[in-house]
């Protein structure tokens, strides 16, 4: 039931992100910008002791859940920081949709946000606990507060352009409920 409700919410959000008719006012969303940006933190990582850890089994399942959730979203580009855990989170959707994973510098979010706002299409951006919420704000969306580094892997942000040039932001949770320490 919860999955069905989430699917209905996402479908409604995506339908609301359809391109505006040609008669839209010039002050509306940039037609050369994104029609949808989806932001997620990487899935559960396999331990902080490794230099570049991959995903746990739970994280791998969450990445597959993400691909299932976004399978009908029409994602046209996938962006990931250059870490194994973010690439592994993006991989199921990239494989399913036949898309390349484009690497961005998560240490220079302002430049990436500016570039993203000039890219048409529907984007998935896979980041980190300290970048995902900040990226929402840099894109003109809302903050939903800091992500708890130790356990919070289930947030997904959907950003769609508003007529005033900002971004409408909806934050949902997906996949298995994370285990809190």
Where are the predicted features?
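Positively charged n-region of N-terminal signal peptides that target proteins for export
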Residues: 1-4
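Bacterial N-terminal signal peptides
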Residues: 7-17
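Active-site-proximal alpha-helix that buttresses catalytic centers in soluble enzyme cores
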Residues: 26-116, 120, 131-149, 154-181
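Conserved alpha/beta-hydrolase "nucleophile elbow" surrounding the catalytic nucleophile
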Residues: 128
């Amino acid at each position: 039931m919860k999955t069905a409700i989430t699917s209905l919410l996402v479908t409604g959000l995506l339908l609301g992100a359809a391109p505006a008719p040609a008669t839209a006012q010039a002050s509306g969303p940039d037609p050369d910008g994104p029609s949808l940006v989806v932001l997620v933190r990487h899935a559960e990582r396999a331990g902080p002791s490794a230099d570049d850890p991959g995903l746990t089994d739970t994280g791998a399942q969450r990445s597959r859940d993400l691909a299932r959730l976004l399978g009908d979203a029409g994602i046209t580009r996938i962006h990931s920081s250059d870490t194994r855990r973010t690439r592994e989170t993006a991989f199921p959707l990239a494989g399913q949709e036949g898309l390349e994973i484009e690497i961005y510098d998560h240490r220079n979010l302002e430049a990436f946000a500016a570039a993203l706002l000039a890219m048409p299409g529907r984007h998935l951006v896979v980041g980190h606990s300290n970048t995902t919420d900040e990226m929402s704000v840099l894109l003109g969306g809302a903050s939903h507060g800091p992500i708890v580094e130790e356990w919070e892997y289930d947030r997904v942000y959907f950003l769609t352009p508003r007529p005033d040039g900002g971004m409408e932001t909806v934050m949902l949770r997906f996949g298995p409920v994370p285990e809190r320490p």
